[in-house]
From Swiss-Prot:
Protein's cellular compartments: Cytoplasm; Golgi apparatus
Signal peptide feature range: none
Keyword Ion transport: no
Designated name of the protein: Dilute domain-containing protein SPAC25B8.08
Family annotation (InterPro entries): Dilute_dom, Myo5p-like_CBD_DIL, Vascular_dev_regulator
MF term (GO), any: GTPase binding
Keyword Hydrolase annotated: no
GO cellular component labels: cytoplasm; Golgi apparatus
Origin species: Schizosaccharomyces pombe (strain 972 / ATCC 24843)
Domain Dilute: 180-464
Amino acid sequence: MDQWSDNKDAIGMLSESLKEKVVTNEIAPALKEVKNHKYNFETEILNTGNVWNNDSKNGESGSAFGLDKIFQSSDSGNIAEGLELDLGNIMLETHNLESPAWKHADYDGVAASVNDNNNDWKFFVFDEREIDSMLQLFVRDFRADKPALRLAPSKLFYLASRFAFFYMPKEKELGTVLLNAFLCEVNQVTQQHPNDMVLCVQWLANVSLLLFYLKKDNKLDDLTVDIQNRCSELMNSLYITICQDAMRRMNENLEEGMVKYTGIQGLEDILRSRSWNLLRRRPTNDASTSPRSTPSASPRSITKIIASTLHLLEVFYIHPLIRAQCIEQLFSWLGARLFNIVISNKKYLSRAAAMETRFNISSLEEWSQTNSPKLQKPFDYPDEDLKVDLISKLLSLVQLLQWLQCLYRLSEDEDPRALQETLESLDALNPRQIYTAAKLYRPDITETKVSKTFLKKLDAFHEEKLREKINSSDKGDVSYEFELLKDETVFSPLKLPTKAQLINAYSYIVSGNGFNEDRKIVFQPHVSNILIDKLEENGLSMERAELPTSVFEDELQRREWRPDQEVEELLST
């Protein structure tokens, strides 16, 4: 991550870059005209005509992505418990988006959310000596204590970068320095708090929105190619951090909740009948030995963490494509982790234990079926085979459990045809995994040990498949395809949204897609009065910012400069 520290020295030198400010009587009125010049940001810069439509059909509102449905959910308390969060800290109150307060941007309940001078600010004018203070206020110490502030940093630094690129001396490259500093600080803050999922999701949302602004700004798109690449890299890093945090939370209770938990009546005695330590005296209170006596370790505790993660991604308006990949990654990890737990522990390799684990896995399948509509991927994604299929991530685990439930009967029946058909149907398992499960199989109370003859048949099947693989493979070593355990550390590469998909989600002109009505308020780039108040409370003031004198190269250019003409030229396509 050395690239994120490249700008550390530059950030520290910003406060020393200017010793004095020159404010002329002629520049100040010009600045005022620039501030007050009116234009429609979405029309001039974010023109989004003829983009694709995804989430709604026949005029449906697509409210699944709206705040109303999210905030009115009856499971908010469960979500807080699943992630050990106080959801009050991220302001999950319900708002009526059709109310006059929201339509007039008075949704913070205190003051108008956009600056009084102009509802669509095109620049944020600042002094380069104040960059470090801006980073301190809106990155290092920033917490979104109001819903209106969740995406405020990306808006502030985007509008500030427009001023830096268009009005600051080009030789200083202040726009590039500013955005690099912003991304560098975000990376450092999230690395220092990898277990704070709210913080990481918040910055993933802001970096995503910044990437959208830069791609849609015709003037900045070509100037910020390297910045956009850094945004993509940081988004990938944050995506991994968020997934790893959710995995860590699930892993704490995964074995207790998904493998040991007994939800089927009558299986507890069978599971205990073949206990490892038969000489140890059992507790007199049978209830104390049952995982059912610990409600914190149950299949529901796992699905709550997944639901909580998805809920946070929705609350912070993470792009639907990224949301889907995040949940898919969690299911992929769950499938691999549970598979390894079962196959590497002999006490779980029994018919009764497999039945119980399979019953618990059904809670994951039920959750995926219920929530799949929330995870629809954009249909125009170039990969045609990119589909949301969470259940397939558990296929190897499910087939292992099926094999454990039927292998003893197959060994007793001695039917070669039935055995061959069964082995061929277990296409998600390799022969080594099939053989190991049978070899370590623990008979239930009514069963006997698996015969050696049956194991020899499985061993022959293993060797035959290995020879076929070697003969058909160009590479000599194919042993990696016959590994016993699944790789739990594999992360699928994050597929970032295309420009059209970003427009579909974040542009408030598009109808009926992405985040629906919320976009009309949430995604407009502006600097709210709340942010300006924070600046002034910390000694920064809009009145102290100024256009640099280098904008006017000589007296003639100074006399002929017209703000409206300048802005029109800058925003021309």
